[in-house]
UniProtKB/Swiss-Prot annotation:
One of its GO terms (molecular function) is zinc ion binding. The keyword Protein transport applies. Keywords: Cytoplasmic vesicle, Endoplasmic reticulum, ER-Golgi transport, Membrane, Metal-binding, Protein transport, Transport, Zinc. Mostly expressed in seedlings, roots, cotyledons, leaves, trichomes, leaf primordia and flowers, and, to a lower extent, in mature siliques. Residues 1-95 are annotated as: Disordered. This is Protein transport protein SEC23 A. GO terms for biological process: anther wall tapetum development; endoplasmic reticulum to Golgi vesicle-mediated transport; intracellular protein transport; pollen exine formation. Coiled coil: none annotated.
Length: 880
């Protein structure tokens, strides 16, 4: 998203397992003396209210808390850089929501925090105590104030900061080339644990922030001080205690992450809460204009799909071509359907007659499995002699019909009202070509004289349909396959506005079938709202993710609430929001605070408020700040800001140049000049960052690997909404080499891994490649065993990833091997000492093996990583 004017905010547009065993540093301990008492008074709002636009979102000065995640090495401190432009509201954009990998698949287990007195301004309205802890008047033995003394770094898969410390100096913190921000995900479903609280939270009456482990507590009166606005608040006596140990019994005062859960079946029209996850309906909307080869694959995928559904899942089946066929499950062992015209939107009267008739259009799987198989077996290939792209497809009318049968008889009662149904309903479209008939359609030929206007009209209509689906708590996923051009710009708004995803597949085979199953069963909350609050020194300048501006009437507001509020289109751990932040001024305090609050209804119909609070230390030292930078999180944030501007191939070429300039600027601002040279050394603390960005500029997101603009558009939208783990893999592939004994060694993604006696797995997010060397392939028995081991690992690595990646296996020298080779850094051109420094495994090769490896490469003009860095007049950093 591009930055909007100050008060505008836009969202583009969503966490996989963290890397295990990565330590999380703790912030510096800096005990602060108590500050003198201050009379509490209302604090006026300090941040402008964010405003949103369709493709971008800027927001007020908000801060985002960050919990640590071991796998991704999240840290507790984080610098706050600012863009070079004047502060403005965050920019929000909403590209397609990919079901990427969540931040971490391991559940977060926040650790309890210790308490102690610290600096705070407290009101003199509590005569029994002074803010410095000394007793007065009655001379009670109780300490006056209890406050967090040393925050313990808690592991969290939900928030990742680009650094775990914040620079105090505004000028340095806001260097745009590096930047500061956070990647935030709603995370996994709630699980039993001490973090669950089944009562109303204590919130600041002034700004709306929640009580947390960093709040100062007057244990004599139970008052607590907000860390965001410093307002004093009552606790209705709940926080009155004789010692700080008693306060540790409150999860919100001892854990940085808590889930406030309110249960109860408040939603009409669904079964009890215990069964609600599987009761939300799934409606398949299937293209009937397929040729026989595609149809056979689709039928196999559909049969497997219904067999995988839970018995209580309610299923609907709709076919579309020139007409819309809505299948009736009331006829046992027979495929029976009611047919409506696809030329225009179905009228309310016709749908009412259908729904109130004798037909059953949504039926639980335990009662309709046999009928579903009969319906799929009855499908026939397209018989007319019409090119694929010119066949009439009324997808828009079919989705409208699907929405109508999901709403059912209660639709007219809910007119103008947002009904809260139990769990997200899903419409899954199986498409093999463009929408060319009925509402939202475009002409068969792009040379039609009125095509640009008709395309614009169709895009707007599809976006409105997506918004209507979201209003009725229904997600529309569009799974496309085949070789026919799909006119992605028209289909994309429907998926995006409803909170769904659009995915392209080569065919309707295995990968399509896996995605079909994962689309229907992935956990997703509804009615999501994200609130971000932070210290007054921090400004959120841009938001990228699957959401849009939340209007004030849709959520609770407070007197001086400066929170950035985002309406989430879907609540899934496979998606995330990327927040860019700046310093509003030089920071005087030793810490800054961030608080994220996710409000949503989960799949079990419980209302959940997930609150995450974090305290990051501030530093003057540039070196200390750079050491706290998380290269991977920083690279993902930079990549998302870059991809937001790369809307087409021409933009992508321009963005490669901006990556080059970014590297040069970081070296200039934070590096050092080489003596007696015009070269600059890249900061050694950021040793991994330039290589990650090199992968970005030459990979499928910005490079020339993907040829068709539809594929590029889908990949871009998927990336902008993806969770941290999937985003990282889409930027920089992970390379694993099979070793003797069945183990795998992780190596840099360099072409030096292409050793003829080895097998290599390359995980690039949406694609996983298995490369078998020629020497290994010659031994059929051994290569079969190695291939099986590689496939098993590839499936394990991507087990919960959505969309499911393609897994392709090929031999060295085959035509498909080019997909693998083009994603590896061409390090074979570097001198031996650089190869050994950056790819240590090569030291294990004999001289003969190294010569053989070198001779296997075909020379071409593309620069290696080291050559690229030197072309920018920058000395590459030594690898860690």
């Amino acid at each position: 998203m591009a930055n909007l004017p100050k008060s505008s905010v836009n969202y583009p547009g969503t966490l996989t397992p963290l890397e295990p065993n990565r330590p999380s540093p703790q912030p510096d301990r800096t005990p602060v003396p108590h500050s003198p008492p201050v009379v509490a008074s209302p604090i006026p709002p300090r941040f402008p209210q964010p405003s949103f636009r369709p493709d971008q979102m800027s927001s007020p000065s908000m801060k985002s808390p960050s919990l640590l995640s071991p796998a991704n090495g999240i840290r507790t401190g984080s610098p706050i850089p600012r863009l070079s432009t004047p502060p403005g509201p965050p920019v929000f954009n909403t590209p397609v929501k990919p079901a990427a990998v969540p931040f971490r698949t391991s559940p977060a287990t926040p650790q309890p925090m210790a308490y102690s007195s610290a600096n705070s301004s407290l009101p003199v309205s509590t005569p029994s105590f002074y803010s410095n802890g000394s007793s007065v008047g009655s001379q009670r033995d109780l300490p006056d104030v209890v406050r967090m003394e040393e925050p313990i770094a808690a592991d969290s898969p939900y928030v990742l900061f680009s650094a775990n410390k914040v620079l105090k100096q505004k000028k340095l913190a806001n260097v745009a080339s590096l930047g500061f921000g956070a990647i935030v995900s709603a995370g996994r479903e709630i699980s039993p644990g001490p973090q669950i609280i089944q009562r109303d939270p204590h919130r600041c009456l002034n700004c709306g922030a929640y009580s947390n482990p960093y709040s100062s507590i007057l244990i004599g009166s139970g008052q607590w001080q907000c860390v965001i606005c410093e307002n004093m608040n009552g606790s209705k006596g709940e926080y009155v205690a004789s010692s700080k140990n008693e306060l540790q019994n409150f999860p919100e005062l001892s854990l940085p992450l808590v889930d406030y859960v309110q249960t109860g079946n408040k939603r009409p029209g669904f079964v009890p809460a215990s069964d609600s996850r599987t009761s939300a309906p799934v409606v398949l909307v299937i293209d009937e204009c397929l040729d026989e080869p595609h149809l056979q694959h689709l039928q196999s995928s559909l049969h497997a799909f219904v067999d995988s559904l839970p018995q209580t899942t309610r299923l609907g089946i709709i076919l579309y071509g020139r007409t819309v066929s809505i299948y009736d499950f009331s006829e046992d062992s027979v495929a029976s359907a009611d047919v409506i015209s696809g030329a225009k939107s179905p009228s309310a009267e016709s749908m009412k007659a259908l729904i109130y008739g004798t037909g059953v259009y949504l039926s639980p799987m335990h009662a309709s499995l046999k009928v579903a198989h009969e319906i799929f077996s009855s499908l026939r290939p397209y018989t007319l002699n019409v090119p694929e792209a010119s066949r009439d497809r009324c997808l828009g009318t079919a989705v409208e019909a699907a929405l109508a049968i999901i709403q059912g008889p209660s639709a007219e009662m809910s007119r103008g009202v947002v009904r809260r149904a139990g769990g997200n309903s899903r419409i899954i479209v199986c498409a093999g070509g463009p929408i060319t008939y009925g509402p939202g359609s475009v002409p068969h030929s792009m040379s039609h004289p009125n095509y640009p206007y008709m395309e614009k009209t169709a895009i707007k209509w599809m976006e409105n349909l997506g918004r209507e689906a979201h209003r009725h708590n229904t997600v529309v996923d569009i799974l496309c396959a085949g070789t026919c051009p799909l006119r992605v710009p028209i289909l994309q708004p429907l998926a995006k506005a409803s909170g769904g995803v659009l995915v392209l597949h080569d065919d309707f085979g295995e990968a399509f079938g896996v995605d079909l199953q994962r689309a229907a069963t992935r956990a997703a909350g509804s009615h999501g709202l994200l609130e971000v609050r932070c210290s007054d020194d921090i400004l959120i300048t841009q938001v990228i993710g699957p959401g849009e501006e939340a209007h004030s009437e849709t959520h609770e507001t407070f007197k001086s609430d400066a929170a950035l509020s985002i309406q989430m289109l879907s609540v899934e751990e496979t998606q995330s929001f990327s927040l860019s932040m700046e310093n509003k001024r030089d920071i005087k305090s030793d810490h800054v605070f961030f608080q994220f609050a996710f409000h949503y209804s989960d799949v079990y119909q419980a209302d959940v408020s997930r609150v995450i609070t974090f305290k990051l230390p501030t530093v003057d030292s540039i070196s200390a700040y750079l050491q706290s930078v998380e290269d991977e999180a920083s690279a993902v944030l930079i990549s998302k800001r870059t991809l937001l501007l790369a809307k087409n191939q021409k933009d992508a070429v321009d963005m490669r140049a901006t990556v080059d300039e970014r590297i040069k600027d970081i070296a200039l601002k934070f590096g050092s000049q080489v003596p007696k040279s015009k070269l600059y050394s890249f900061p050694k603390e950021l040793s991994s960052l330039p290589e990650l960005l090199f992968h970005l500029r030459r990979g499928p997101l910005l490079g020339n690997i993907i040829g068709h603009e539809d594929e590029r558009s889908v990949l871009r939208n998927l990336f902008l909404n993806a969770s941290f783990d999937l985003s990282l893999r889409m930027v920089a592939p992970r390379c694993l080499m099979h070793q003797e004994g069945g183990t795998f060694e992780e190596l840099p993604a360099y072409d030096l891994s292409m050793q003829s006696d080895k097998a290599v797995i390359l995980d690039h997010g949406t694609d996983v490649f298995i490369w078998l060397g020629a020497e290994l392939s010659a031994d059929e028995v051994k290569s079969a065993a190695v291939l099986a081991a590689c496939r098993t690992l590839a499936e394990e690595l991507t087990e919960f990833r959505f969309p499911a990646p393609r897994i392709l296996a090929f031999k060295e020298g085959s035509s498909q091997a080019r997909y693998f080779v083009c994603r590896l850094i061409p390090a074979h051109k570097d001198p031996p000492y650089e190869q050994e420094a950056r790819f240590p495994q090569i030291r294990t090769l004999t001289t003969e093996q190294r010569m053989k490896l070198k001779s296997s490469f075909i020379e071409f003009d593309e620069a290696s990583f080291c050559e690229w860095m030197r072309s920018l007049k920058v000395v590459p950093p030594e690898p860690r």
